Amino acid sequence: MLDQVCQLARNAGDAIMQVYDGTKPMDVVSKADNSPVTAADIAAHTVIMDGLRTLTPDVPVLSEEDPPGWEVRQHWQRYWLVDPLDGTKEFIKRNGEFTVNIALIDHGKPILGVVYAPVMNVMYSAAEGKAWKEECGVRKQIQVRDARPPLVVISRSHADAELKEYLQQLGEHQTTSIGSSLKFCLVAEGQAQLYPRFGPTNIWDTAAGHAVAAAAGAHVHDWQGKPLDYTPRESFLNPGFRVSIY
């Protein structure tokens, strides 16, 4: 099933690129929480929803662009968790650092994940405890790697005081910044060793990247040391967390 989901992410990426390259208008509007949404978000959402309903008609889908109410979700044990365009701010800035995120959740755990970066044409995927990166038609297994000093990857759009204080106390390290779920993927492929997050995220922002990072050997825990959990709950918000090889 992983190959079909990867193809679905590519199809969604193609829909996004039609807007990104100007073939179709961007049509930026603000949602209720003041976050931006574009025609590309909606186009990718439609592609993925249609594809998953065909692929697994009995498995419900939670997408950022049309999340079902709590009364619908509360008893879900297995479901798809989708962010059709993760990094909308990066998309609007046209820096290429945005992704299509698709994850399969089973009893609170992301057991399959796909993160596709359309501009870079790079696909990260994970299933059955293994993670892969596909680039230029070549697919290879990836895993975490230690480095000294460690490289810490941080958000390009969400710096905050807590993060600055954490980095000051961390000891010797280097930092790099990148948008969207690519932060999880840098840890997964051994380029970075730590991704700390204090600012707000939603479950669809993290599930696919979580699957990839965990399958590559990283730990994805909240600041109390518990694994991020995707068991349905009323709020879509995650606690703060860190993705680490340590």
Curated annotation (Swiss-Prot):
Metal-binding is among the record's keywords: yes
InterPro entries per record: CysQ (IPR006240), CysQ/Inositol_MonoPase (IPR050725), Inositol_monoP_metal-BS (IPR020583), Inositol_monophosphatase-like (IPR000760), Inositol_monophosphatase_CS (IPR020550)
Residues that bind Mg(2+) 1: E64, D83, L85
Subcellular location field: Cell inner membrane
Molecular-function annotations in GO: 3'(2'),5'-bisphosphate nucleotidase activity; magnesium ion binding
A single Gene Ontology CC term: plasma membrane
BP GO terms, sorted: 3'-phosphoadenosine 5'-phosphosulfate metabolic process; phosphatidylinositol phosphate biosynthetic process; sulfate assimilation
UniProt entry keywords in alphabetical sequence: Cell inner membrane, Cell membrane, Hydrolase, Magnesium, Membrane, Metal-binding
Chief subcellular location: membrane
Phenotypic consequence of gene deletion: Mutants require cysteine or sulfite to grow under aerobic conditions.
The protein's required cofactors: Mg(2+)
Signal peptide (from-to): none
SUPFAM superfamilies in the cross-refs: Carbohydrate phosphatase
Assigned EC number: 3.1.3.7
Residue positions binding Mg(2+) 2: D83, D86, D205
Annotated family: Belongs to the inositol monophosphatase superfamily. CysQ family.
UniProt xrefs under HAMAP family: CysQ (MF_02095)
Function: Converts adenosine-3',5'-bisphosphate (PAP) to AMP. May also convert adenosine 3'-phosphate 5'-phosphosulfate (PAPS) to adenosine 5'-phosphosulfate (APS). Has 10000-fold lower activity towards inositol 1,4-bisphosphate (Ins(1,4)P2).
Protein name as it appears in the record: 3'(2'),5'-bisphosphate nucleotidase CysQ
